[in-house]
Amino acid sequence: MKVVILSNGPGNYSTKRLAEEVRLFGHDVQIVKYKECYASIEKSNPTVKYQGEDLMVDAIIPRIASNMTRYGTAIVRQFEMQGVYTASNSIAITRSRDKLRSMQLLAKAGVGIPKTVFSRNTADIEDLLDQIGGTPVIIKLARGTHGNGVVLAETKKAAKSVLQAFYLHNEDGTNILLQEFIKESAGEDIRAIVVGGRVIASMKRQSL
């Protein structure tokens, strides 16, 4: 089986380890910088090219950076059109990059989450804060990684100031979320790895 790892960081530890494991299972593996891929959309013969050659593969492992989500998932979709197996499909990747969409899906599935509210109207701030139990409150952008765009507002005044600043740069209110502050978490969260609908590993992450 020929496997392609889509990664713009071929030298990254995680990418190299994935390649090592694929080889251990006896498969051929190639690391491809998806930002350098280009595609042809055709009804009968959709293609993906890299360095002038058609990529003919059996499976892909997408490692799509958050700042390349739109282009990266477009390349993944192109492989999906060919019937190529993908470890993470384009829909799952897109959903995971939108915190609001993720929260809605988790809540629908019955998974416990912090109380979360959103609105695009600054006049709703008072009611939003009341709905999640007041301050302190977590305010975050729906799209962001590594803690960027996340603020802990200790008071109502601080929360209003942060929200008003965020609203100035985000006309679409779904880009801004307010969440109840879970004191007991103390900057910790749990990351779970799900394969085939089952959690196969987990880790606790502690903010510095």
Which residues does each predicted region cover?
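Extreme N-terminal starter segment of soluble prokaryotic enzymes
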Residues: M1-V4
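Short hydrophobic segments within beta-strands
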Residues: L6-N8, V195
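Phosphate-binding site of ATP-dependent enzymes
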Residues: L152-L208
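Short, hinge-like loop/turn segments at secondary-structure boundaries
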Residues: T47-Y50, M103-A107, I132-G134, T155-K157, ...
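ATP-grasp fold ATP-binding core
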Residues: L106-A107, L129-N148, N170-S185
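Conserved N-proximal alpha/beta basic substrate-recognition cap immediately N-terminal to
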Residues: N8-K115
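Rossmann-like NAD(P)H-binding beta-loop-alpha module
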Residues: G112-G134
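Structural detector of well-ordered beta-strand residues that form the stable sheet scaffold
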Residues: T86-A87, P114, I138, L177-Q179, ...
